[in-house]
Swiss-Prot record:
It is found in: Mitochondrion. It comes from Flaveria trinervia (Clustered yellowtops). Coiled coil: none annotated. Belongs to the GcvH family. Residues 55-137 form the Lipoyl-binding domain. Expressed in roots, stems and leaves. Binds 1 lipoyl cofactor covalently. This is Glycine cleavage system H protein, mitochondrial.
Amino acid sequence: MALRIWASSTAKALRLSSASRPHFSPLFRCFSSAAVLDGLKYANSHEWVKHEGSVATIGITDHAQDHLGEVVFVELPEVGGSVTKATGFGAVESVKATSDVNSPISGEIVEVNSKLTKTPGLINKSPYEDGWMIKVKPSNPSELDSLMGPKEYTKFCEEEGAAAH
């Protein structure tokens, strides 16, 4: 009986504390739980690109990591190698599946996120910041023009989700 009273009061306290906190959400969302950030470009294979100066940072989207589940291993390419648009450069292994990661653009790999080797879960915790995968010097910057902006990617995800049901 005491356990039931404790559980009831704890549940009530949790409802009250979560109801009183302000709710912050990203600018865009694919589904109710997947963030889509402004200022990035997106591929229909669910990778993102952040182009700054002569370097483009690439990773998988929040939508992709959400569908994969807990990431347990990341395969990354070598610095100095090259990537080709729409071609695989690595893989992400989760508790659910292993997925190839495609490059949204072509170019030379100038940096890889070596933190992912020891802490692959960074992709789940921070797909757009700490969970980036590679940095590339684009060989054809105009390829960025063929990628989706945040609004287009959000619509793409919604349509993809509707088609799956």
